[in-house]
A protein has these predicted regions:
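Helical "substrate-binding/catalytic lid" subdomain
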Residues: 24-153, 157
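Rossmann-fold dinucleotide-binding core
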Residues: 1-37
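ATP-dependent carboxylate/acyl-activation modules
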Residues: 10, 159-161
């Protein structure tokens, strides 16, 4: 049972949840990661738009952190270098959570959505974007390197090969 496993799980992590019946935890994980993949693309788009508009990205980042545009990718795991210490974007996108793992989770989320006839247009688009990014040889980069896709020719950051 969950209660008997909880002490062991607490050794492995600090946020332990009981999501429901068998399999619900996996479902919750892919729902969370679908939202994360979508929001990382959105954060990347917003910051790269600021760059193209010649607005100081650090200023936009500060504004977004304290405004309605805040999200986990903005406040905790920014997709562009120089915005926060200790994140993969400041380490040539060496993975914390790889693009390949994000692509796998997005694919699983879309398969589950299709199975239960859930409408997930943003999840489907994020899945396509990450799948293409991985097929281009980026599956072992951090998932925040997706900023390279939306940045186009304005993206001029160093990435680990």
């Amino acid at each position: 049972s969950f209660d008997s496993a909880k002490p062991i799980l607490e050794i492995m992590g600090k946020n332990i949840f009981h999501a429901g019946d068998l399999g619900c935890g996996n479902g919750a994980k892919i729902c969370n990661n679908m939202a994360l993949g979508i929001s990382m693309i959105g954060a990347s788009e917003a910051l790269m738009l600021a760059k193209r508009l010649n607005i100081d990205i650090k200023k936009v980042h500060e504004i977004m952190k304290s405004a309605s545009g805040n999200s986990w990718p903005i406040s905790v795991y920014p997709p562009l270098p120089g915005l926060k210490e200790g994140v993969p974007s400041n380490n040539k996108y060496r993975p914390g959570f790889s693009a390949g793992m994000m692509s796998k989770d997005l694919k699983l989320a879309i398969e589950c959505a299709e199975e239960v006839k859930a409408n997930t247009p943003l999840g489907s688009e994020a899945n396509k974007i990450y799948e293409k990014f991985c097929k281009e040889g980026n599956d072992n980069k951090d998932f925040s390197a997706i900023s390279k896709v939306v940045g186009g020719d304005a993206w001029d950051y160093e990435i680990d090969n």
